[in-house]
Swiss-Prot record:
It comes from Pisum sativum (Garden pea). This is 1-aminocyclopropane-1-carboxylate oxidase. Pathway: Alkene biosynthesis; ethylene biosynthesis via S-adenosyl-L-methionine; ethylene from S-adenosyl-L-methionine: step 2/2. Keywords: Ethylene biosynthesis, Fruit ripening, Iron, Metal-binding, Oxidoreductase, Vitamin C. Residues 153-253 form the Fe2OG dioxygenase domain. The gene is ACO. Its EC number is 1.14.17.4.
Length: 317
């Protein structure tokens, strides 16, 4: 089995830049995932985020989760559950307008560090998008511009905890899916594993690594790259012991951003369009009902809708 791709961002400013860019290229083409180290986010900040996230779960969310489990009788299930996930979550919106001040039960210190963490992740996301542009032969800033709607991109963070599960063979932590959006940056627990991706019809563990950021590509990057890069099915396996923390930040197109394959990435003599052109919010509305199904029917449905939907040009910045 090939080794999971680990990208040392610090090597981009050394004589190893070419090989590092090749590693990113291979990861995007063949994995849809890679893990970043030396990414510019301080160890101290990451440790604080982890500490306060776990404290918040214990203080404000653990009991609610236990009550939900008891209400639904999940500890006694005898057959596979396919309509819910074994996770406790809340969501923070950063762009276009932050919702952090509106989320109840967050301590002031937690709000402050999550705002700072989000700014660092936004910078990293935009740096990575430009690296992808370089590998794809697109002008610098192309992907960021493609994600811009009238109010800029959407950016938010899903904070998840996966408590110990008594029946992991019957209940998934998070069911298999591809991500709808652009580029996803994950700060995951380094002690409790669970995240897996599908590669060559086999489920492969995404290795927990302290202070790393896991990157994966969403459906929108598959469309814009005309399939050169792929979004990949992934899931979270619940564990019988140990609670797993997951902080996933989604740098997505704006609601009214128009998404379509980059013209320079269309193949010569390509007689039929493989990927549709659509407004991102229209895709999200479709995705919400089909998240845990294959992505191809979503693309096909958007393709069929193309003739009846008028979309304008990409917003310039």
């Amino acid at each position: 089995m090939e080794n999971f791709p680990i990208v040392d961002m610090g090597k981009l400013n050394t004589e190893d830049r070419k090989s590092t860019m090749e590693l990113i290229k291979d990861a995007c083409e063949n994995w849809g995932f890679f893990e970043c180290v030396n990414h510019g986010i301080s160890i101290e900040m990451m440790d604080t985020v982890e500490k306060l996230t776990k404290e918040h779960y214990k203080k404000c969310m653990e009991q609610r989760f236990k009550e939900m489990v008891a209400t639904k009788g999940l500890e006694c299930v005898q057959s596979e559950i396919d309509d819910l996930d074994w996770e406790s979550t809340f969501f923070l919106r950063h762009l276009p307008v932050s919702s952090i001040s509106e989320i109840p039960d967050l301590d002031d210190d937690y709000r402050k560090v999550m705002k700072e963490f989000a700014l660092k992740l936004e910078e990293l996301a935009e740096e990575l998008l430009d690296l992808l542009c370089e590998n794809l032969g697109l002008e610098k800033g192309y992907l960021k511009k493609a994600f811009y709607g009238s109010k800029g991109p959407n950016f938010g963070t899903k904070v998840s905890n996966y408590p110990p599960c008594p029946k992991p063979e019957l209940i998934k932590g998070l069911r298999a899916h591809t991500d709808a959006g652009g580029i996803i940056l994950l700060f995951q627990d380094d002690k409790v594993s669970g995240l897996q991706l599908l590669k060559d019809d086999q489920w492969i563990d995404v290795p927990p690594m302290r202070h790393s950021i896991v990157i994966n590509l969403g459906d929108q990057l598959e469309v814009i790259t005309n399939g050169k890069y792929k979004s990949v099915m992934h899931r979270v396996i619940a564990q019988t012991d140990g609670a797993r923390m997951s902080i996933a930040s989604f740098y997505n197109p704006g609601d009214d951003a128009v998404i379509s394959p980059a013209s320079t990435l269309l193949k010569e003599n390509e007689t039929s369009e493989v990927y549709p052109k659509f407004v991102f919010d229209d895709y999200m509305k479709l995705y919400m009902g089909l998240k845990f199904q294959a992505k191809e029917p979503r693309f096909e449905a958007m393709m069929k809708a193309m003739s009846s939907v008028k979309v304008g040009p990409v917003v310039s910045i």
